[in-house]
From Swiss-Prot:
Class of the enzyme per the UniProt entry, highest EC level: transferase
Record's function text: Catalyzes carboxymethyl transfer from carboxy-S-adenosyl-L-methionine (Cx-SAM) to 5-hydroxyuridine (ho5U) to form 5-carboxymethoxyuridine (cmo5U) at position 34 in tRNAs.
InterPro entries per UniProt: CmoB, Mo5U34_MeTrfas-like, SAM-dependent_MTases_sf
Assigned keywords, A-Z: Transferase, tRNA processing
Highest taxon in the source lineage: Bacteria
The organism of origin for this protein: Shewanella baltica (strain OS155 / ATCC BAA-1091)
Gene name of the encoded protein: cmoB
HAMAP family to which the protein is assigned, alphabetical: tRNA_carboxymethyltr_CmoB
Molecular function GO terms recorded: methyltransferase activity; transferase activity, transferring alkyl or aryl (other than methyl) groups
GO BP terms, alphabetized: tRNA wobble uridine modification
Family: Belongs to the class I-like SAM-binding methyltransferase superfamily. CmoB family.
Record-given protein name: tRNA U34 carboxymethyltransferase
């Protein structure tokens, strides 16, 4: 069974220690709720990942574990077969002992767009909301973060993350907890909070922004990346049914509307640092994710539109700072 005890020990004497009042019981319930289904099968695969400590790691320019020279061809083939049992791999890529996990998303491209605009992560405590399998968490660690905590309720993402961590070394201060943000108390503790690719999946985007704010210390930085549309501060797309074949997209605001929402939620120093139309090469079908991908979500006759006729995915990155608490918002 995946254990979170090392995380509990690490935060026991930190500014996250009050989280221990509720976290163990919440995660214990999550484990009991997932005693059946795929999790036990994936945990058996994790228990087979017994390999020597890697001769090198790189989290600065990529997520690379091992040079590729440590394992024999047979050992490498066995490892690849084990890692393929965690398919589909959506966020990456990862380079593990010479094995290239070519994920659906080129998450490194997103990181390259974001990293130049954020405050330096050196010695920061970081929260990554909706972290997927943890690719960006490793890059945050490579940027000097003191501790990185990711939350994502998916059992598969947790097991993919655990696979990489067990191969990279469990001593690294990066942790994935299978939680949604609504399960977090107001921690007011993180120096930087990332929410990338989450906001449009939330039924109440304002509540999501307030939940993000509640995790930051005063003066902490929010890095928000989400789908946007063109338009003024009153422009918000509410898909009638599906958007890009996704049935869980609720609100897609314009950049101006999103910045207004952040201001209303008592953020300050709000700025849009990047907008980017998602390229077909950034999200695509691969050998490690053989299902439908972006090209199938777009109109085959006009890739500037989704199959439903909405504007094709365009993403913006907004950076904002948590202001002093506003008692009107708290109440």
């Amino acid at each position: 069974m995946i254990s979170f005890s090392s995380f509990y020990q690490q935060i026991a004497d930190s500014n996250l220690q009050h989280w221990l009042e509720t976290l163990p019981s919440i995660l214990g319930k999550w484990q009991r709720d997932h005693k059946h289904g795929n999790l036990p099968k994936w945990e058996k695969v994790l228990n087979k990942l017994h390999y020597p400590a890697p001769d090198q790691v790189d989290f600065i320019d990529s997520v690379t574990v091992g040079s590729g020279e440590q394992l024999s061809p047979g050992e490498k083939e066995k490892l690849e077969n084990l890692l393929r049992l965690f398919m589909p791999w959506r966020k990456g890529p990862f380079h593990i002992h010479g094995i290239h996990i070519d994920t659906e998303w080129r998450s490194d491209w997103k990181w390259d767009r974001v990293k130049q605009h954020i405050s330096p992560l050196k010695n920061r405590t970081v929260l990554d909301v909706g972290c997927g399998s943890g690719y960006h968490m490793w890059r945050m660690l490579g940027s000097g973060a003191k501790r990185v905590v990711g939350i994502d309720p998916s059992p598969l993402f947790l097991c993919q993350f655990e696979a990489v961590k067990r191969l990279a070394g469990t001593h690294h201060p990066v942790h994935l907890l299978p939680l949604g943000i609504e399960e977090l108390p107001p921690l007011d503790a993180f120096d930087t909070v990332f929410s990338m690719g989450v906001l449009y999946h939330r039924r109440s985007p304002i509540d999501h922004l307030l939940q993000l704010r509640d995790q930051l210390r005063t003066g902490g930085e929010l890095v928000l990346e989400t789908l946007v549309i063109d338009g003024d501060e009153n422009a918000v797309l509410v898909p009638q049914d599906r958007y890009g074949k996704m049935n869980n997209v609720w609100f897609i605001p314009s950049v101006a509307a999103l910045m207004l929402w952040l201001k209303k939620c008592d953020f300050t120093d709000i700025r849009c640092v990047d907008t980017d139309v998602t390229a077909l090469a950034e999200q695509r079908r691969t050998d490690w994710m053989p299902n439908e991908s972006l090209v199938e979500y777009l109109d085959p006759n006009d890739i500037t539109k989704t199959v439903e006729g909405y504007p094709a995915p365009k993403r913006a990155t907004i950076i904002a700072v948590k202001n002093q608490p506003n008692q009107d918002l708290i109440s």
